[in-house]
Structures are given as structure tokens and as C-alpha cells.
Regions:
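Terminal targeting signals and extreme-terminal segments of soluble enzymes
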Residues: 1-152
């Protein structure tokens, strides 16, 4: 992999920090590199269902945020086309959930990802995601080096 230009990495970091859904879900920290991302959030009562446990939509959305950061991490604007999630166990108020997305394959137009959500060492949900990679670039196409654009 080529060296990621630091000014562009900083710019993408600011874009990810501004994500309104991540903010509203209390995403407190995230890590990312090209093709991968990890985000974390603590389940609050606002995201429980009528049974008093974590709503599946909370887990789905947290996984989707990790997917969006991972798929946009090369600088190209990418959009989720399909996400298929399996819930393995419920989560409780106060649980810190970590969602990680890892790129499995990437072509010029599409990329696929494996997504895992954990509470501690326990897998609570897993998913696969397929994204569409547009021709548009975050921060303006002209800001990205030509060799980076050709490679990614």
C-alpha cells in the first residue's frame, strides 16, 4: 500500500468526526485505515426495544457506521448497497459495543466487507456489506495524487 498523504487522512478524519448518526449514537472513538474501520459506542436506554434490551437497529447502525468509514477510507465516495446482519445475542444497557469492518475484496466499482460487533470478547452480531464506489472523491478529486487515484 502506498503512503497515505497525511493532510488527506486528516481531512477524511474530520469528515468521519462530523457524521451526524455516529454523533447521535454516542460513538466515542474510532480507528480507521484504508479498507478497515472500528467504532465503539455504549448502549443507552435510548436505543433499547420494548423488551428492555438493545434494539437490533442500534447494532445494525453501528455496523453500518463502521462499514461507511471503511468503505470511504480510500477517499472515494462509497455507498452501501446491501448489508446482511445476523444477531448472535442481545446487548444490555451499559454494554460497550465495538463494530469492526474489514474489506474482503475491492474492484473499481464495488467492494465487500465483513463486519463484526463485539461486547468484550463476545461476538454479538456479524454482517456482510456490499458497497458501490463512485467516481467522486472526498475533499475534491484534484487534492488526491494521481498515483493514489489510480491505485484506489
Amino acid at each position: 500500500m502506498q503512503d497515505f498523504p497525511q493532510d488527506l487522512k486528516d481531512g477524511l478524519n474530520q469528515i468521519f468526526l462530523s457524521d451526524p448518526t455516529a454523533k447521535s449514537m454516542g460513538v466515542t472513538s474510532f480507528d480507521w485505515a484504508p479498507g478497515e474501520a472500528s467504532v465503539r459506542s455504549m448502549l443507552t436506554e435510548n436505543f433499547t426495544n420494548f423488551l428492555g434490551v438493545g434494539h437490533g437497529g442500534f447494532l445494525f447502525s453501528l455496523g453500518d457506521i463502521a462499514l461507511s468509514f471503511a468503505s470511504n477510507s480510500y477517499g472515494r465516495k462509497s455507498l452501501a448497497m446491501k448489508v446482511d446482519v445476523t444477531y448472535h445475542r442481545g446487548v444490555q444497557v451499559g454494554d460497550e459495543v465495538v463494530a469492526s469492518a474489514t474489506e474482503m475484496s475491492r474492484s473499481r466499482r464495488f467492494a465487500s466487507y465483513q463486519i463484526e460487533l463485539h461486547v468484550g470478547d463476545e461476538l454479538v452480531a456479524s454482517a456482510t456489506g456490499l458497497t458501490f464506489r463512485t467516481e467522486d472523491w472526498h475533499l475534491g478529486e484534484e487534492t488526491w495524487p494521481e498515483d493514489w487515484k489510480k491505485a484506489y
